[in-house]
A protein has these predicted regions:
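The feature marks the mature, well-folded catalytic cores of soluble enzymes
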Residues: 1-240
Length: 240
C-alpha cells in the first residue's frame, strides 16, 4: 500500500476509478495563506521522499486521513511536521516544492523547508528555480519530463534521461499557463496526468518517453487539456 496526495478535486476523480484501490488517497486541504488560484496545490504543502513532510497548516487534517489507514507508530516514524508555513509572496510559497529523485534532492536551497534538508540522505543540488517540483514530472527512478530547459540541462548532467518539452498548454486558472510537472505524478508503474495529453503539442513525444521507461499512462479526463493541480504525490508505505 502507498499514500497518494492530491488536491480535493483530483482526489475525487481518482477515487472514482478502480485503478488505485491498493492505495490510500489523501485529499490535501487548501493552504490558507496561499494565493487562492493555487491554494489547492499539493506540492506547496506536502513533500514525499524518505519521510512525508507536511506544512503545519495542513498537517492535522492530513494526519487524520493517514491515521485511518495505518498504525500510530508508523505515523510517528514516517510523518514530520515542517517548520515553515507556505505563504505569499514568492519565494515564501515554495519551501516544500522540492524535487525528490532517486539519487538527488533538487531545489533553490536558500528557501527549502529545514525539515526536508534534515531528513535528506542523498546529495542536494541547488538550482535557481523555486518551483522545482512543479516544473518536473518524474517518470520512474532515472527519467523526467520538464518544460524548464535550464532544469533539464542540470538533470542531464546528473545522469538522468530528460525529455524537454515546450512551455504552456497546461491550464491554471488566473494565469496564462501552468507548469507541466504540476499536472501529474508517478504512482508505481503508472504516470497519472490531470487531463488529456492529446491537447498538448508534444503529446506523442511524451507518450513515447513514458512507454520507453515501461510506464503506463493514465489520463484522468479525456475531454479537457492538462490542468496544473500542484502535482500528484506518492509515498510508498515500504519506503524505509
Amino acid at each position: 500500500m502507498g499514500f497518494i496526495f492530491a488536491s480535493k478535486t483530483v482526489a475525487t476523480k481518482m477515487a472514482s476509478l478502480n485503478l488505485f484501490s491498493g492505495h490510500k488517497i489523501i485529499a490535501v486541504p487548501d493552504g490558507p495563506l496561499l494565493d487562492e488560484r493555487f491554494a489547492d496545490h499539493v506540492d506547496l504543502k506536502v513533500f514525499c521522499d524518505d519521510k512525508i513532510i507536511l506544512s503545519p497548516d495542513v498537517a492535522e487534517e492530513v494526519i487524520h486521513q493517514i491515521r485511518g489507514a495505518i498504525s500510530e507508530s508508523w505515523i510517528q516514524s514516517r510523518v514530520v511536521i515542517g517548520d515553515k508555513t507556505p505563504r505569499m509572496p514568492y519565494p515564501n510559497d515554495v519551501p516544500y516544492n522540492v524535487l525528490a529523485l532517486k539519487q538527488h534532492l533538487i531545489h533553490k536551497l536558500e528557501i527549502t523547508e529545514p525539515q526536508i534538508l534534515k531528513h535528506c540522505h542523498k546529495p542536494v543540488i541547488n538550482v535557481r528555480q523555486g518551483y522545482t517540483r512543479c516544473s518536473v514530472l518524474p517518470v520512474g527512478e532515472q527519467a523526467v519530463i520538464t518544460d524548464d530547459a535550464s532544469l533539464g540541462d542540470t538533470l542531464r548532467t546528473l545522469g538522468y534521461d530528460v525529455l524537454i518539452i515546450c512551455k504552456g498548454h497546461v491550464q491554471l486558472a488566473g494565469f496564462p499557463y501552468g507548469l507541466f510537472g504540476g499536472s501529474g505524478g508517478s504512482i508505481g508503474n503508472k504516470v497519472v496526468m490531470n487531463g488529456c495529453l492529446k491537447f498538448h503539442p508534444d503529446a506523442e513525444r511524451i507518450k513515447q518517453f513514458i512507454l520507453k521507461h515501461h510506464k503506463v499512462l493514465i489520463e484522468l479526463d479525456d475531454q479537457q487539456p492538462l490542468i496544473d493541480c500542484g502535482s500528484i504525490l506518492f509515498y510508498d508505505e515500504g519506503v524505509s
